[in-house]
């Protein structure tokens, strides 16, 4: 293990000076940050992320955090002996599973992240989409083609939802008042049923409703890769759709990019897919010239 390079006071001052125009660009702007379960990693990684979020708030940025929790949910289900199945990239969520999902997302993960942000000097408020009827959802549906019959079949995903409406009443009471919303991706139906919502989709819906300056999707890959597995630093919506059509963007990256496109069409200025395991990834993206990850824009 090597020691971190020593930076002279002059270099430290230069770094801060070079960050100034970027800080001014995001002054009083809302940034929605989706923090994936895989990106959370170890406790020190999560605490470093929390410190960066507090730094954003201290520089007059309005951060809104949406967290995932797939690995943590899987771990809890395994401990309880509940089998977990996936279809079309989404967790099939039956009555027993939705209770565990809500406990892990709105309980342990949400409150742990709130604690880390508060420990770093921020004022975080932990919520989920059910609070204040913030995010209303309808039952999600997916189809798959049976490999034998070639017949398209509708998959019952259980209590998995798609955001239908975002009510900003509660969020608007927090944003801009030195409070940092930390949101678990749960929503409710018109009848009061709790739905598990994909965290990327949830973050895209919230960012779109807020007309956020940026949506950052922190994940466990560097961003969108080309056919040679090299990072694509920037894409337009048109370029992204072409890459989906020709298969360059495939698998789990497709719904992420589709979330980016949706958010942009709702008024978000730019969306970035980036590796949340990179130290200070959020600060690198927002406050440096080179940024990090893949920026998708109109």
From Swiss-Prot:
The record marks 34, 256 as: Transition state stabilizer. It comes from the Bacteria. It catalyses: N-acetyl-L-glutamate + ATP = N-acetyl-L-glutamyl 5-phosphate + ADP. CDD domains: AAK_NAGK-C. GO terms for biological process: arginine biosynthetic process via ornithine; L-arginine biosynthetic process. Signal peptide: none annotated. It is found in: Cytoplasm. InterPro entries: AceGlu_kinase-like_sf, AcgluKinase_fam, ArgB, Asp/Glu/Uridylate_kinase, NAGK-C. One of its GO terms (cellular component) is cytoplasm. Its main location: cytoplasm. It is an enzyme of class 2 (transferase). Substrate binds at residues 69-70, 91, 196. Pathway: Amino-acid biosynthesis; L-arginine biosynthesis; N(2)-acetyl-L-ornithine from L-glutamate: step 2/4. Keywords: Amino-acid biosynthesis, Arginine biosynthesis, ATP-binding, Cytoplasm, Kinase, Nucleotide-binding, Transferase. One of its GO terms (molecular function) is acetylglutamate kinase activity. Belongs to the acetylglutamate kinase family. ArgB subfamily. Catalyzes the ATP-dependent phosphorylation of N-acetyl-L-glutamate. This is Acetylglutamate kinase.
